[in-house]
Amino acid sequence: MSKIRTLNRQFISNLETHKAVTDAKRNLILSILKSTTTKREAKNYLTKYQNQFDLPDETPKAGTIYEQSLSRRDNQRELFIKRFLNAQNPFISIYDDEETKLQKIPLRLAIFKIKFPTISLRQWKGIAETFKRLMTLGISPIILLDYDHLSHGSFKKNELYMINQANKMLSILGKPEEQEDLKATILRNSFSVADGQITIDSLELILIPLYQGIIPIIQPIVFNADTTMQEFLKCNTLLNSLCTALVDRRTTDLLSIEKIVMIDPLGGIPSIERKQTSHVFINLSQEYSDIMSELFIGHISPKIRDLHVENLNSMNEILTSIFEKSGNDETTGIITTPEVMSIHNDQLNPIIYNVLTDRSIISSSLPSTNKRTPQLSTTIVKKGVDVQIFDQENNFSGSDFTMDNLIASKKVDKKKLTELLEDSFGKKLIVDEYYERINNRLATFILVGDYDGAAIITWEYSGDKKVAYLDKFAIAKRNQGLPGLADIIFKIILQSHPVELIWRSRKNNPVNKWYFERCCGCMSAPESQWKIFYTGDIFDKRIDRMKDKKKQNNKKKKTATMMMMNNSQKVAGVNADTHVDILKNLEQYSDICEGIVPSFA
């Protein structure tokens, strides 16, 4: 009878375990699907982070106990800790054993530099919830405390202040004995400096807590071997040194740095275009020098400017260093405020949202003048891709700016460009006819990376009207869905032709919704296969809808049907004395777009 009771209890226990595991897996997957906007994003996230979730298997897998145990994240990490403490290579006989061939489970790091003197208790509680969510999603956080605001006075006085602040932070993050609370530890004297070179004394002191699910909180204190004294260093300097040490070759299998996050009351890098709110996305390879110059033109005070310059410089140095040392260009920089980090919503918290989707909350190519485009205090930063812009004024010294001359001067590889266009559109290009048509009409050619994407803008005519026409906007299939790439190209297109730009798209093109959000208006004739989009400075975004509706009703006899997009759009020129004849423009746009022959067979 006792055996039956024992079996019954074991059966019930197994059922409860099965239910707990099933619920944990389901809840995690549902939360991910809810927070990501596309299947591609959910798939990309799960591909990278799925082995970070140490959910127990419901049924034992075939294989040895050794294989089963070491295929689990926590068991691998426990073994790593033991080997670290014994100064052994943690991967011996784990990944090199041909019979075992276990999957590596690296730490996915997010390094936070927190400047927190003005963070309120409410914000701290929200920040703690964000850290919990990040750890649930597979991120291992490291916190570096920023005390650059302290005066260079007594070391003891500053040290006491730092200890008090760190203890307050620990109490807010949670009680270690509580299962649901965060666990953190404060690390002092992690850095040493000798002959001007900063080193980390023991990387294991940082990695072992991470393997144990504990957040290391690092104080910006260094031991100066030259003076045998302790001192404080600038936090950005230590952040750079920490990242350099973590991407050392011997850590390749142990970890990857996914995010560099700067929590600063100032928020992201300010943008003139966005009326002092933050740049949404910065492609450092293309925009770094321009944005740095923009910061010095006097639209913000020198004191605030210098802090933003320091943040941008530091982010550029770190992301460049990570790329050069590890070849990883996927690390993302995030600069935001304590208030924003404390938001408890996956789709509104830019840090959590970026972990799930690897992009910013809003698209950087959305018109900043549109009232429906949110104003943000967060900037997403990437090492990014190289961009070349060819037009009569840039990167071309020939007498005639034609596609033939670009190809002849080897600035453009015709074969690669053709392959890109065919790959992007999934159709065969009518090569000779296409290049002949655009040759003498070329206005701008934009090339991204090694033919990862491109845009071709031509000059088209309707009578004596000359209009910039987006002839081709192509992204290689392998890069379609790559965060930010389409935005990078489209922003350059609009910057290259800010006054007036048109393009066409087939009515059934699923990309039309994306185009619709970025144009001033669009139109289509019932008998046409095309939807025509237009944008530019000649269209003032603040339209009186009633006046516009009245104007359309007065012109009802015309064959083209117009669909005005924006609720707040006005057909007016750039200055008050200039007005645009919208109907005439639309007729010209229609003539141009309907008259261009298809480029693909």
From Swiss-Prot:
Keyword match DNA-binding: no
EC number(s) stated in the UniProt entry for this protein: 2.3.1.1
Keywords: Acyltransferase, Amino-acid biosynthesis, Mitochondrion, Transferase, Transit peptide
Reaction(s) the record says it catalyses: L-glutamate + acetyl-CoA = N-acetyl-L-glutamate + CoA + H(+)
Pathway: Amino-acid biosynthesis; L-arginine biosynthesis; N(2)-acetyl-L-ornithine from L-glutamate: step 1/4
Main location: mitochondrion
rRNA-binding as UniProt keyword: no
Cellular compartments annotated: Mitochondrion
Any GO BP: ornithine biosynthetic process
Domain N-acetyltransferase as annotated: residue spans: 401-558
Domain of life (superkingdom): Eukaryota
GO annotations of cellular component type: mitochondrial matrix
Positions of disulphide bridges: none
Residues passing through the membrane, by range: none
InterPro entries: GlcNAc_Synth_fun (IPR011190), Vertebrate-like_GNAT_dom (IPR006855)
A Gene Ontology molecular function term of the record: L-glutamate N-acetyltransferase activity
PANTHER family, per the entry: AMINO-ACID ACETYLTRANSFERASE, MITOCHONDRIAL, N-ACETYLGLUTAMATE SYNTHASE
Family: Belongs to the acetyltransferase family.
Biological function: N-acetylglutamate synthase involved in arginine biosynthesis.
Name listed for the protein in its UniProt record: Amino-acid acetyltransferase, mitochondrial
Organism encoding this protein: Lodderomyces elongisporus (strain ATCC 11503 / CBS 2605 / JCM 1781 / NBRC 1676 / NRRL YB-4239) (Yeast)
Gene: ARG2
